[in-house]
């Protein structure tokens, strides 16, 4: 999608004026110089003055020059343990894509769901969110959006066949948008609404699914890194399994809220009433045609290949190793090792990732039986280096916020503002602020700034750190309103099926629902599971360490 001249001009002005307005901050202390660097980075990310990955490297130069963090301390931040873990998930996602396993799983489940529009929408959202457990939200949307378009095209062909309209419509031009290819303008309001709901559901479900697993998305990894760094003696812990216990139950409620909003907005509330109605003869015929098309798409994939089976087994081994290393309620395989502190989740991730580069994709191929599932050329062409560097920049921002004292400054300011406020209104306020911020900044940068701050605010107010940090982390993924908020939104908006107003309205309603659901979860299920009414022992609050603010 080529940007308009007006948008290009606005971006150039933003890139020029943003840092210029913040220049006075350079004449104050390190915390204000750190704030300048954050404004500089945010402006360049939003304005896209450089590629996102290139902008993400600026902290390596800005922090030493502005005397915020020495170069030797900021450079290793870009290759933390959590970064390695994220790289392993991206490599596994590449293997899934290389073998076509994701498409087989999606189509197989859709053959079981059926072709009734409301049921298909719900089934597609569940499938997308499940895939997003283990694949980044951007990759998940990029994988599932074409699948959704293929399903909609098959439905459109089935409708034409049902009408016995054998006149071939004028083929769309090569540069036609998805909306033009689907001929949405010629559809009934119900069918057009279903198309819009299914396309937008790709973004919603992938973002929601990313909240379920601690390795799924950047803010979750930022949270994990902050917990490990801030509480090295285990005063506060969060294992892979503990996160699932916290995040999966509300994820289903987020998904249900998104489903209800999409159906009501695009298809009308009466759709739920029609769910239980007996279909007409024409509707039953159409349903059979669509199901037949889906079945044909699945059969065209052929038998399950050796590569698909191999990736599936490695996938299960990887997830199993993460869950069983330190389950929390019982000793894991990590406890069997003499030096358990030497092992983290990235170890099994690296081992399996390396195997994927030598394991044969098809040992029965007469031409090249030893061709591996992944090649190094895939790392050069398909690996998301920009996303990896973006998360590294997020950790760099977090390091600068901590070392410069900006975390303490903001924490004390927030404490003074929220003094006398009870814990529930405080939590709702913080979550709402994060949701607003993440609509205009990347979820990683938002999390990198506010997760350590939320931990500091909670400690300084005598509240369990997880009570504010968990909703802060999850809220970073609630970027549903704008195309610039997150890449999944940009992917679905680029289809031209969804208008800006439709995305904003649905996203706004879903944001409100997610804030309320998160608060309900934190004050019921999570409050009980993690004993959030008890402040952890052995948390040392020292004025000499900016990580533990004393106001």
Curated annotation (Swiss-Prot):
Coiled coil: none annotated. Keywords: Ion transport, Membrane, Sodium, Sodium transport, Symport, Transmembrane, Transmembrane helix, Transport. One of its GO terms (biological process) is transmembrane transport. It is found in: Membrane. The chain crosses the membrane at residues 9-29, 34-54, 82-102, 119-139, 194-214, 243-263, 347-367, 417-437, 449-469, 497-517. It is a multi-pass membrane protein. GO terms for cellular component: plasma membrane. The keyword Protease does not apply. The keyword Transmembrane applies. Its main location: membrane. One of its GO terms (molecular function) is citrate transmembrane transporter activity. High-affinity sodium-dicarboxylate cotransporter that accepts a range of tricarboxylic acid-cycle intermediates with 4-5 carbon atoms. There is no interaction with monocarboxylates. Belongs to the SLC13A/DASS transporter (TC 2.A.47) family. NADC subfamily. This is Sodium-dependent high-affinity dicarboxylate transporter 2. The lineage of its organism: Eukaryota, Metazoa, Ecdysozoa, Nematoda, Chromadorea. The gene is nac-2.
């Amino acid at each position: 999608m080529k940007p308009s001249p007006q948008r290009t001009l606005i971006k150039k002005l933003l890139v020029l004026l943003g840092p210029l307005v913040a220049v006075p901050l350079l004449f104050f202390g390190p915390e204000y110089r750190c704030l300048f660097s954050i404004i500089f980075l945010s402006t360049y990310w939003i304005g896209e003055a450089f590629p996102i990955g290139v902008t993400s490297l600026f902290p390596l130069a800005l922090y030493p020059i502005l005397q915020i963090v020495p170069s030797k301390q900021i450079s290793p931040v870009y290759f933390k343990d959590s970064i390695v873990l994220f790289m392993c998930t991206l490599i596994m996602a590449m293997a899934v894509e290389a073998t076509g396993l994701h498409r087989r799983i999606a189509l197989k489940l859709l053959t079981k769901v059926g072709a009734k529009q409301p049921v298909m929408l719900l089934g597609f959202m569940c499938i997308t969110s499940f895939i997003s457990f283990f694949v980044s939200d951007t990759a998940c949307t990029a994988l599932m959006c074409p699948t959704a378009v293929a399903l909609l095209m098959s439905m459109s062909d089935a409708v034409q066949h049902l009408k016995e309209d054998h006149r071939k419509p004028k083929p769309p031009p090569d540069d036609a948008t998805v909306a033009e290819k689907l001929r949405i303008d010629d559809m009934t309001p119900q069918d057009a609404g279903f198309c819009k709901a299914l396309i937008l559901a790709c973004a919603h479900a992938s973002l929601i699914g990313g909240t379920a697993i601690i390795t799924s998305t950047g803010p979750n990894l930022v949270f994990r890194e902050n917990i490990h760094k801030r509480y090295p003696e285990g005063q506060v812990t969060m294992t892979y399994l503990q996160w699932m216990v916290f995040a999966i139950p509300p994820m289903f409620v987020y998904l249900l809220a998104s489903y209800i909003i999409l159906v009501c907005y695009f298809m009308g509330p009466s759709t739920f009433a029609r769910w239980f109605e007996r279909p007409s003869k024409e509707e039953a015929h159409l349903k059979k045609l669509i199901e037949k098309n889906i079945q044909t798409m699945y059969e065209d994939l052929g038998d399950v290949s050796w590569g698909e089976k191999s990736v599936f087994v490695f996938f299960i081994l990887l997830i199993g190793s993460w869950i069983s290393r330190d389950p929390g309620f019982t000793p894991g395989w990590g406890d069997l090792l003499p030096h358990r502190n030497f092992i983290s989740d990235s170890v099994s991730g690296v081992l399996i990732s390396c195997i994927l580069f030598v394991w044969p994709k098809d040992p029965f191929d007469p031409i090249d039986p030893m061709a591996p599932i992944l090649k190094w050329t895939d790392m050069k062409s398909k690996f998301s280096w920009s996303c990896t560097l973006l998360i590294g920049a997020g950790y760099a921002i977090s390091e600068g916020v901590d070392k410069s004292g900006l975390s303490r400054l903001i924490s004390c300011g927030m404490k003074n503002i929220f003094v006398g406020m009870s814990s529930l209104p405080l939590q709702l306020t913080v979550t709402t602020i994060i949701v607003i911020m993440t609509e205009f900044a990347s979820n990683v940068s938002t999390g990198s700034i506010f997760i350590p701050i939320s931990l500091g605010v909670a400690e300084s107010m005598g509240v369990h750190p997880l009570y504010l940090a968990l909703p802060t982390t999850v809220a970073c993924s609630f970027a549903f309103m704008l195309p610039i908020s997150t890449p999944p939104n940009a992917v679905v908006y680029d289809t031209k099926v969804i208008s800006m107003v439709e995305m904003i309205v649905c996203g706004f309603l879903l944001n409100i629902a997610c804030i309320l659901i998160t608060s309900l979860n934190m004050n019921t299920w999570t409050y009980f599971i993690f004993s959030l009414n008890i402040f952890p022992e052995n948390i040392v609050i020292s004025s000499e360490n900016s990580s533990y603010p004393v106001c």
